[in-house]
Amino acid sequence: EPLSGFADPYSVTVGYANQSRKLGCEIDIGNEVTAIKIDHGRVLGVKTSTGDVNSDRVVIAAGPWSGALLNELGLDFGIKTVRHQVFLLDRGDKVVGWPPIIGDVALGFSARPDIGNVIMVGVGEDEVVGPCEYNQSVDTEMLIKIQSDIARRIPGVLDATFVGGWSGLFTVTPDWHPILSKIDGIEGLYVAVGFSGHGFKLSPMVGQVMGDIILGQTSKSIDVSSLGADRFKDGRPMKSRYDMQVLA
């Protein structure tokens, strides 16, 4: 993929925020949304830690905290949060050139170059945790395993030095595909949740799609009708396009 790559999430987020403010958006940082205000099947706004905010349209896009907000409305889409570990491995000064960007379905890890000769490796999607209480560090056992696994793809990584790591959260749905839709039965309520670790790269398109949905328009960019909130209740989960083959 000659046009593939990666971006710094902090810089991109700040860039989005700054441009949004120029376009008239108000961003309220550190003000927790505690509940969605509903009356007679219609959205009235949200309750926050500093008071109510009134609006006839609300998009729940709270990542790991989306499930709790939906559950308070009696909505359960099977959303879970899982812990994902990230390791930084330094290959040393003698190594020349960057390694490839890898997504290894068989061994269950992804990797990309970082600063200098450091490789960033992400792994683990099985440990279900709460969004506020989980181990934000990494596991020694997983470090040993992942260093052995990635050495099968990039020789020499077994000698790399562990220089840091952390754990974050994926928000996942039962079929590991996002929900992008309005909520039937509650006028003015919309959801954009469950990106399984892909939300950062998909966010520009998600913003366009959700804008179309809120305006009652068919998206001109991509058909997201299969990502509706009712697909689980109706027995229409999405199928994964990830696949692997073994050559014997």
List PLM regions with ranges.
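Mid-domain beta-loop-alpha active-site segment that forms a flexible
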Residues: E1-Q19, G63-W65, A106, M142-D149, ...
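Helical element adjacent to the flavin cofactor pocket in flavoenzyme catalytic cores
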Residues: E1-R57
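Active-site lid/adjacent beta-loop-alpha segment flanking the redox-cofactor pocket in flavoenzymes
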Residues: G78, R91-L189
